[in-house]
From Swiss-Prot:
InterPro entries: GlnE, GlnE_rpt_dom, NT_sf, PII_UdlTrfase/GS_AdlTrfase. Keywords: ATP-binding, Magnesium, Multifunctional enzyme, Nucleotide-binding, Nucleotidyltransferase, Transferase. SUPFAM superfamilies: Nucleotidyltransferase, Nucleotidyltransferase substrate binding subunit/domain. Belongs to the GlnE family. Residues 464-955 are annotated as: Adenylyl transferase. It comes from Ralstonia nicotianae (strain ATCC BAA-1114 / GMI1000). This is Bifunctional glutamine synthetase adenylyltransferase/adenylyl-removing enzyme. Residues 1-458 are annotated as: Adenylyl removase. The gene is glnE. One of its GO terms (biological process) is regulation of glutamine family amino acid metabolic process. Involved in the regulation of glutamine synthetase GlnA, a key enzyme in the process to assimilate ammonia. When cellular nitrogen levels are high, the C-terminal adenylyl transferase (AT) inactivates GlnA by covalent transfer of an adenylyl group from ATP to specific tyrosine residue of GlnA, thus reducing its activity. Conversely, when nitrogen levels are low, the N-terminal adenylyl removase (AR) activates GlnA by removing the adenylyl group by phosphorolysis, increasing its activity.
């Protein structure tokens, strides 16, 4: 991204286009180029020298305050008149000093806009202080009816003032607010609070905007207040909130993005009001869910603004005699025209409005900061942001130079040739043609990015429009639609028509707004077309209709799919490829947003980046527990969906899928632990001495999309409060993981593998756990619990406890064991598992039937428990396939048979995974499908345990 650099016009001083005095020691730049500065200097002796001194360094708030004090005292008038004169004289000095620093190359764009913003805030505060003192003497102080506290006028700066981007000859957009209704107290002529603040507001506007012999301070625009010019000048927070709920319009959301309190935020009253104001404005501006409806709304607003800009430009051209400038055919209004400043602002704001409800990091005001944040999140390319940044700075600098000439609030390029050359030289170009050429390049780049972001991608005539728009209750037209469906490849056209008819005449469809209904109609037609391209069109369209039923009440989702046809194509593929994926997307339609990021759909996960991003979102949510729970669920669902999409595209096999799902679960557990600890009111230390150990699928890193988590909780803390604190911690953790919120749930959790199962303590001191596993004492672990240890691992929490657990696990596994008793125990446990998962069908259960996955897992566990004392490498939690290979290489079992069984396990897992994706709860296949693989598994079992038929459960 191009760094900001000051722009100097020094090479072009003393040009014929600038008939001012020759440059000298005093204001050589502004006096050469600004007619307004020339007039000020000619009117007041010594004025230019004072401004020259002020321009020696950046304009600071301290300097503003000191200089205002001097001018106020020198005015020698009544306070309000002295205020007006001092602010106007100060404003002229600030304008000229900034022009000098800017044109000389001493000031950056940020310095100029920052200084103008500082001055505007200072002027508003100074005016309130002076006028408020006079009003207080007459009417007393406004007091809140409920709180009994003195009230203050809260001034909200909107637009560029709110974003600290004020230009040098700008008006300022203000909104006047106050906290409570009530009356003034302590004065001879009391008023209601509303009357008092209205009077204060009017006099504040006059103090800033009245044109006197000294000029003006700022033009003040109050039209952004509730109900615009028809609304009260000052309104209470309660009225503002009611207005947002009842009448708030879409464009007002954009305006309030940059709304910022500019009156003194330091007082306790102001701090409280700011907090209350955020509570009112945040849900209005930033919707809780992804809001893609703003794209069409901004597109419409932009068209209206551009048309108005063109009308103004045409009027300006007529006023200037229709100068035949080469730029007039392009876009003379650099703010509102094609490729102008407003288009850059809209590109930035659309990301805020769509995602700001969920991403606190996008709730910022300056345009360039928003673009940088969007690039960091992958919402827009870094190259595009660099181009927009360069264009924005160029356009803002050009805007300032247009305004320096006559202190006019203009954004139009000049028509007079002498002014065209003047502006070109102020921008550092030798002539006007060179300026226009560069301007056109920037405008083209901005317009191209704007069109890419906001272009209307809707089909003019969707291919299946005749089907959905037909009167589906009319027999003749229904027959035509039926024939078209058959032609498109639908097998059971009557069933499809029945579903379409039910959807079209449902109360849900009828309740849609006109705009949402139009989008729904468009999407149904696209869905019919996309489904027809799949191998099973009937199934796909049925899933589409279920999906549309789920999302139809959320106009944002309809907007997203309408605006991004490529997302619709990916939805079709997802719905067709997997019943489980279709159900998952239907339950979590916010995941539609993930379909827009093509790069993310093919990238490997960055778990460190994931942790940092989620941690930042959780931190930004503060103490909002439900919001934090939703953030964890949103992030987990999004990452799961990315894995799922890569899976459906054939990019991953089952092993890396399980690895990624397990890594994701680890990360979510870690983040949840961090967050929940802060919610434990009885916590006794900054960092808990607490660890989560995973067993089962998560422990073996064989997690599936819908697997539950087998967890136990260990702590190593001798504080007398520790057992109670960590028990509460564990219970709260489970609640956070398993609760259903608006965003869904995270995991089902099973803690029955803890010592003594469901009858045992929820959390276990590490030393007690060690004694239990090592069988020191009467309360000792069973063989099946040592079997479970073969694929247990530390997954979250205190890494020191995790390391001690791993050392203990290895020690337990390496204990010497007698083959006979161990074989009997494990064979008996296998029989009990088989009895608990009876298969009444002729199908082969890939997991539980003899010759299936459980036989392989129990065989591996037996080999690990029997031989780890001699072969330490068997204690590695490396997965069943790797452990089978090790056992074969060590000669513990036949190596060739081990390889065949490993292949069978891999095949079983892949088949199980596919069946789960197809929505089947039991992983069963026709018996002959896997007969060869199952025979190898049974052969290995018989080699290790003896005949399957001979095995029987122990009493």
């Amino acid at each position: 991204m191009t760094a900001q650099a000051p722009l100097s016009v020094a090479p072009f001083l003393q040009t014929p286009a600038c008939p001012s005095e020759a440059p000298g020691a005093v204001l050589p730049f502004s006096l050469n180029y600004s007619r307004y500065v020339q007039r000020l200097a000619q009117a007041r002796a010594g004025w230019a020298e004072r401004v020259q001194a002020a321009a020696a360094g950046p304009i600071s708030v301290a300097w503003l305050s000191a200089r205002f004090g001097e001018l106020f005292e020198a005015a020698a008038a009544e306070p309000e008149q002295a205020l007006k004169r001092a602010l106007r004289l100060l404003r002229n000095e600030v304008f000229a000093a900034l022009a000098e620093r800017d044109l000389s190359g001493a000031a950056t764009l940020d310095e100029v806009t920052g200084a103008m913003t500082d001055f505007a805030e200072f002027a508003v505060r100074a005016a309130i202080a002076v006028i408020g003192q006079e009003l207080g003497a007459l009417h007393g102080q406004p007091v809140g009816q409920s709180s009994g506290e003195v009230q203050e006028l809260v001034v909200v700066g909107m637009g560029k003032l709110g974003g600290r981007e004020l230009n040098v000859s700008s008006d300022i957009d203000l909104i006047f607010l106050y906290d409570e209704e009530g009356d003034t107290q302590g004065g001879p002529r009391p008023l209601s609070n509303h009357e008092y603040f209205t009077k204060l507001g009017r006099r504040l506007i006059n103090a800033l905007a009245d044109v006197t012999e000294d000029g003006y301070v700022f033009r003040v625009d109050m039209r952004l207040r509730p109900n615009g010019d028809a609304g009260p000048l000052a309104c209470s927070l309660g009225m503002l909130e009611e207005y947002f709920v009842v009448q708030g319009r879409e464009w007002e959301r954009y305006a309030w993005i940059k709304g910022r309190v500019i009156t003194d935020p330091g007082s306790p009253h102001a701090a409280r009001v700011i907090q209350q104001l955020e509570r009112v404005t945040t849900p209005f501006v930033f919707r809780r869910y992804l809001d893609y409806g703003v794209i069409a709304a901004i597109r419409a607003l932009h068209a209206q603004i551009r048309a108005e800009a063109a009308k103004r430009s045409n009027a300006a051209n007529r006023q200037h005699g229709g100068h035949d400038s080469q730029v007039q055919a392009h876009a003379p209004n650099i703010k509102l025209g094609r490729g102008g400043i407003r288009e850059i602002e809209f590109v930035a704001q659309v990301f805020q409005l769509i995602r700001g409800g969920q991403d606190f990091g996008l709730r910022i005001r300056p345009t360039l900061e928003v673009l940088r944040a969007a690039a960091e999140r992958g919402l827009i390319g870094a190259d595009a942001v660099a181009r927009l940044t360069d264009a924005y700075r160029f356009l803002r600098q050009l805007e300032h130079r247009l305004q320096y000439v006559d202190d006019a609030q203009t954004h139009n390029l000049p028509g007079a040739p002498e002014d065209q050359l003047r502006i070109a030289r102020m921008m550092g170009f030798a002539d006007y043609a060179a300026l226009v050429a560069q301007l056109e390049r920037y405008q083209d780049e901005v317009a191209q990015q704007f069109e890419q972001t906001f272009s209307d991608k809707q089909d003019n005539q969707p291919p299946c429009a005749a089907i959905w728009h037909a009167d589906l209750l009319d027999d003749e037209r229904t027959e035509s639609a039926r024939a078209q469906l058959l032609e498109l490849g639908y097998a059971d056209a009557d069933s499809v028509l029945e579903r379409l008819r039910a959807s079209r005449h449902s109360p849900r469809y009828r309740a849609l707004s006109e705009v949402s209904r139009q989008r729904f109609d468009l999407l149904i037609n696209r869905a019919l077309d996309h489904a027809a391209r799949q191998t099973d069109a009937d199934v796909t369209i049925a899933r589409f209709l279920d999906f549309f039923d789920a999302i139809s009440r959320r106009s944002s989702y309809l907007s997203l799919l309408s605006e991004y046809p490529q997302a619709m194509a990916r939805v079709a593929h997802t719905l067709h490829a997997s019943r489980w994926a279709a159900d998952y997307l239907t339950r979590h339609p916010q995941l539609l947003d993930e379909l827009l990021d093509t790069e993310a759909l093919s990238a490997a996960p960055d778990w460190q980046g994931f942790r940092e991003r989620v941690r930042e979102r959780l931190r930004a949510a503060g103490d909002h527990v439900e919001m934090q729970m939703d953030i964890l669920r949103q992030e987990h669902h999004a990452e799961t969906f990315r894995i799922l999409l890569q899976d459906l595209q054939g990019m991953l096999t089952v092993e890396p899928i399980s690895d990624r799902l397990s890594d994701l679960a680890d990360a979510v557990l870690d983040l949840t632990l961090e967050t929940v600890w802060q919610q434990v009111s009885t916590r006794h230390r900054e960092v808990p001495r607490f660890a989560v150990v995973a067993y089962g699928r998560l422990g073996g890193k064989e997690l599936g999309y819908a697997s539950d988590l087998d967890l136990i909780f260990l702590y190593d803390d001798d504080d007398e409060r520790a057992p109670e604190v960590y028990a509460a911690y564990a219970r709260k953790l489970i609640t956070w993981l398993t609760s259903h919120t608006a965003a869904g749930m995270l995991f089902d959790v099973d803690t029955r593998l803890r010592p003594n199962g469901a009858a045992g303590l929820m959390v276990t001191h590490f030393e007690a756990f060690r004694r239990y596993q090592m069988r020191e004492g009467d309360n000792a672990a069973w063989v099946w619990e040592h079997q479970a240890l073969t694929r247990a691992r530390f997954c979250a929490g205190d890494p020191e406890i995790g390391a001690r657990f791993e050392a203990l696990r290895i020690a337990v596994l390496r204990q010497p064991r007698e083959a006979g008793p161990l074989r009997d125990e494990i064979a008996a446990m296998r029989e009990r598992v088989l009895e608990g998962h009876a298969n009444p069908t002729p199908l082969f259960d890939l997991k539980h039937d003899r010759g299936g996955m459980v036989d392989i897992e129990f065989t591996v566990q037996f080999l690990v428990l029997l031989h780890s004392a001699a072969y330490a490498e068997l204690t590695r939690n490396a997965g069943n396939i790797a452990l089978l290979r090790m056992a074969g290489e060590l000669g513990l079992i036949d190596a060739a048979r081990a390889a065949r069984v490993a292949d069978a396990y891999r095949d079983f897992r892949a088949r199980q995974h596919k069946l789960r994706l197809d929505g089947q709860s039991a992983a069963r296949v026709p018996a002959g499908t896997c007969a060869h693989e199952a025979a190898h598994v049974r052969a290995l079992w018989e080699q290790v345990f003896g005949s399957i038929d001979a095995a029987s459960p122990t009493p």
